[in-house]
Amino acid sequence: MLKSNKHPRRIFLGHATRLVIAGAITPLTSPALAALPQARSLELDHTHTGERLSVVFAVGDRYVDDGLRTLNHFLRDHYSGEVGSIDPQLFDLLFETRRELGCTQPFEVISGYRCAATNTRLRNTGGGGVARQSLHMEGRAIDIRIDGVPLADVRDAAMSLQAGGVGFYPRSKFVHLDTGKVRYW
């Protein structure tokens, strides 16, 4: 039997260093992230795909890459399947809107990212309200509602944040949020 001439403290420090490095490389699981005090998460239901999602997208002032990728896929163009890159500030806006409302219900997503072809098709179908240079095509806009919360309350909460555009569409039953200039319609 070989005897190690390393001091027990050095052995311990070596193991501890390997664990710290492994922890930095291996991301925490979603439940572990959600338990962190500064975790920011979203709960979403997609009205067109039927998908549901609960995801941590940021902890403190850092975005969580896996959370952002998951959200990008969830908010893909549901007509074409194309996945866009969503502005992380849009997730902050959603998080703060829900916090302002003091509710825990998920957002119902009507529209997230749109490719140019989908945007053109929607403009040409006569539904109205689809901008030629829509921020949906840049991943900077989302159309949402919250079950059981009046649309006007969702609009007012988002407007109070002064963080981007807020469109109110009561006939179509959604509120548009974007990370463009502060404006309301």
Name every feature range the model reports, one short phrase each.
Residues 1-23:
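N-terminal secretory signal peptides and thylakoid transit peptides that target proteins
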Residues 26-55:
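C-terminal segment of N-terminal export signals and the immediately downstream linker at the start
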Residues 60-110:
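Active-site acidic/histidine clusters and adjacent loop/turn architecture
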Residues 91-95, 119, 151, 155:
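Extracytoplasmic/secreted envelope proteins and their assembly/folding machinery
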